[in-house]
Amino acid sequence: MHEFNKGVTLIQLSSALAYSHALMNQVVNPGDHVIDATVGNGHDTVYLAKLVGTTGHVDGFDIQPAAIKATTSALDKAALSHQVTLWQTGHEHLADKIATDQPIKCAVFNLGYLPGGDKQIITKPTTTLTAVKAIQERLVTNGLIILLVYAGHPGGATEAQAVLDYATSLDQHQFQVLQYQFINQVHVPPYLLAIQKR
């Protein structure tokens, strides 16, 4: 029988959002080029801009003017606007905005609707997967695509299944895929998918 090691610190399980930030911390370095595929209210955009520093760059996408406005304000407040380009367009147009030979270290998606916004305007399976595939073509070795997947709103379960099916189908010799999810919560919390290029 093994004695419990009293020097081991037990961790508290983090939310999917907190875990996404932990993953970003591990993979993103100053000077990297990263993508916020759904800028929303700008929280992840600001977080990524801090990680890439003054020598890196963030490209952020959102179709909603309110999201671009909120993110611009958050970046201005944090004095990080100079290292971010915001595109008021859907992330499915990423391939038109980011050069094919531009290496991407990390990309983050918060699927669903804009918090505090119109719940009828949601991300869709076809556009999300178009963006994911465009990023995969530019992703560096050990680079990461992080998707926070929300299934509780109308249309969310369909998108969640499409994204999960796609991620599951990826060749394990080219990508490794992690699913991080709490399975006993009744309010359908988001889960995280992380796709890492080998």
Residue spans for each PLM region:
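Conserved SAM-binding loop of SAM-dependent methyltransferases across substrates and taxa
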Residues: 41-55
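Mobile active-site "lid"/loop adjacent to the S-adenosyl-L-methionine
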Residues: 112-130
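Conserved beta-strand signature within the Rossmann-like core of class I S-adenosyl-L-methionine
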Residues: 38, 138-149
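Class I S-adenosyl-L-methionine
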Residues: 97, 156-198
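S-adenosyl-L-methionine
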Residues: 1-33, 46, 50, 69-101
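Conserved SAM-binding motif I beta-strand of class I
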Residues: 57-62
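A short glycine-rich, Lys/Arg-flanked "PGG" loop and its adjoining helix->strand segment in the class I
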Residues: 127-141
